[in-house]
Design a protein with these regions (language model features):
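Alpha/beta-hydrolase superfamily serine-hydrolase fold, recognizing
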Residues: 2-269
Length: 269
């Protein structure tokens, strides 16, 4: 099913599966998602994977996650899968808070009765998308509908001194917070730091980092784990030695998949 305009289909037969591409969840051209609806779904038990692409808050596309979208469909045929595009940051319009609002708006869309989906979500994000997944799951999900998060190389604490002293720090973070430095507004930087927003109710989290990532200091993993542990949140974290920004070696790529599947099977099957 192709959806180009605001979605006007009134019902999707729950006895059939659907893959809807470019489903609009808002009026902006970037407020689009791909959505897989499994056969025999219902609003009590059909869980939803939500995929949030990376790209420094200002680039990237849901197409980056097409392989993951298709892989989840085949591995977990009873789950729905949403692959999200969101409004990208521009020089005059930073990612925060509009991208968090977009995640909420997309979730509001799939909560409509016509989709027959439960309010149980597992978020997958890479890089900036992992940051958004964690920030939404930890700070913007008061009803605790997010049950788990897979964080791949996501920034977690933007107040980290390793980050503040990082040569490309301000250039990248401008996509998220606009033309504001840490020293100008430390409260904003804490507000958008997932590790600072962890509570005892935060969703279970599995994280992956590379030890020689040029964009993410290794302290980002330990600061997140410290916050999760302090709040008693179940989590797993893996640092791949010698690997960079999510481009794993073949054996680590295999390990990555095994660990993710095992985590989902444990908590979100």
């Amino acid at each position: 099913v192709k959806e180009d305009s605001i979605n006007n289909v009134t019902s999707y037969d729950p006895k059939k599966s659907f893959t809807i591409t470019d489903l609009s969840y808002g009026i902006h051209s970037q407020q689009k998602m791909d959505l897989y609806l499994p056969v025999n779904r219902n609003s009590d038990s059909t869980k939803v994977f939500i995929l949030i692409h990376g790209g420094g808050w200002s680039a990237g596309d849901k197409a980056d996650f097409n392989d993951l979208f298709n892989g989840l469909k085949s591995t977990y045929p009873d789950h729905a899968v949403m692959n999200l595009n969101y409004q990208l940051a521009t020089p005059g319009s930073p990612g925060y808070p509009k991208q968090i609002n977009d995640i909420q708006q997309a979730i509001d869309e799939i909560q409509l009765p016509k989709y027959n989906l439960s309010k149980q979500y597992f978020l997958f994000g890479a890089s900036a998308g992992a940051h958004l997944s964690m920030l939404y799951g930890y700070a913007f999900d008061p009803n605790l509908f997010v049950k788990g998060i897979c964080n791949t190389v996501g920034p977690t604490d933007l107040t980290d001194t390793a980050y503040i002293n990082h040569p490309i720090y301000n250039a990248i973070l401008g996509g998220l917070v606009g033309n504001v430095t840490y020293s100008q507004n430390p409260a904003l930087y804490a507000e958008v730091s997932p590790a600072k927003r962890v509570t005892t109710d935060s969703p279970k989290t599995i994280s992956f980092y590379g030890s020689v990532d040029p964009l993410i200091p290794v302290t980002q993993m330990s600061l997140l784990q410290k916050a999760l542990d302090a709040n008693g949140v179940e989590s797993e974290a893996t640092m791949y030695m010698g690997d960079g920004h999510g481009n794993w070696s073949p054996e680590n790529a295999q390990d990555y998949l095994v660990k993710i599947i095992s985590f989902i099977d444990k908590y979100f099957k």
